[in-house]
């Protein structure tokens, strides 16, 4: 299911934040507990069709969750797609990382996830803002095909656009 892809993307992000000293502890535990959502307060992607957010008026439970229970955990509850991917599906993959001062202040004040978040180090990044990478994919019989050109991801690739 796509929820597993979301969890893996969150774990990869946590590992990167650990390298910067912003997070600590076991990445899988941090994601399970919801500590990653300080930086990743949204889902990983959604299905596309005739419209960008196709069929959302029907309700996410019936489109992206097929009637299964949806998480109520902050961050995870914003994931719009949890069903197994099938050939022919078109969906977005849009991981991101944000530093939201109000959310940082709230969680720090509540001493939330102190075992996973180094709030002193987070303060150094509080005015960074955020970034989100969005690419669209077609699910095929053998995997997935990116729709459109590869976007620059590394600092070197981004700087080369100048």
Where in this protein do the model-derived segments appear?
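Active-site neighborhoods and metal-handling regions in enzymes and metal-associated proteins
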Residues: 1-162
